[in-house]
């Protein structure tokens, strides 16, 4: 697969098949992703893969916490506000996704089911967690996690797998640390759900838009 095809073809998958992802395939993807650039070649990432029974335990526990209305307590703060232009894109994404899924604006039950499904990783059979040492400078370390995480997504796409950066996967890091034996002094930065995309579900076929290059780039 050409790089252009991987970059342009990847999309965020929100409906997965239950078929397990072979561990050797995840290892193959990680072998590629580990070559991602990092500040000073520090490679601050540690990768923990939840699959099989561990994924199910996490999904059940996260969904239970969401059902209780438990406030998320992520190790890395999730943005709650944006500049107007960014907020517009965020709102548009939700509107376009729900339209593609056939969820009406006032259908709070359907929206609630979607968010609960999100806490269950959209049915993905595995979640790849990226953690950092708690003593690290967060901005630089998180930049590096974005580097390896995105490379991981492209490599997964090349292998016929779908992925999604999933903030819901790090809403309750204490649970993730307990289930996955992650030391308390580590910070869970993000989880990437991975699996085989559902071939017909609108949530798996949906693709978000991007700004034209002239809107984001200028020559000084």
Task: For each feature predicted by the language model, list its residue ranges.
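Acidic, surface-exposed loops and disordered segments
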Residues: 1-220
């Amino acid at each position: 697969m050409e790089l252009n095809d991987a970059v342009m073809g990847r999309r965020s998958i929100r409906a997965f098949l239950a078929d397990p992802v072979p561990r050797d395939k995840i290892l193959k993807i990680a072998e590629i992703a580990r070559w991602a650039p990092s500040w000073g070649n520090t490679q601050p990432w540690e990768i923990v893969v939840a699959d099989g029974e561990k994924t199910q335990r996490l999904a059940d526990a996260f969904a239970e916490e969401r059902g209780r209305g438990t406030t998320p307590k992520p190790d890395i703060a999730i943005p709650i506000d944006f500049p107007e232009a960014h907020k517009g894109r965020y709102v548009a994404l939700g509107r376009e996704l729900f339209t593609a899924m056939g969820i009406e604006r006032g259908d709070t039950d359907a929206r609630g089911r979607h968010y609960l499904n999100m806490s269950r990783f959209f049915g993905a059979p595995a979640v790849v967690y990226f953690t950092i040492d708690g003593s690290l400078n967060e901005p630089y370390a998180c930049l590096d996690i974005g580097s390896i995480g995105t490379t991981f997504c492209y490599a997964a796409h090349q292998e016929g797998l779908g992925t999604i950066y999933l903030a819901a996967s790090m809403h309750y890091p204490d649970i993730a640390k307990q289930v996955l034996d992650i030391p308390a002094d580590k910070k869970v930065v993000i989880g990437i759900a991975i699996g085989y995309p559902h071939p017909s579900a609108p949530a798996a076929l949906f693709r978000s838009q991007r700004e034209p290059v002239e809107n984001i780039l200028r020559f000084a």
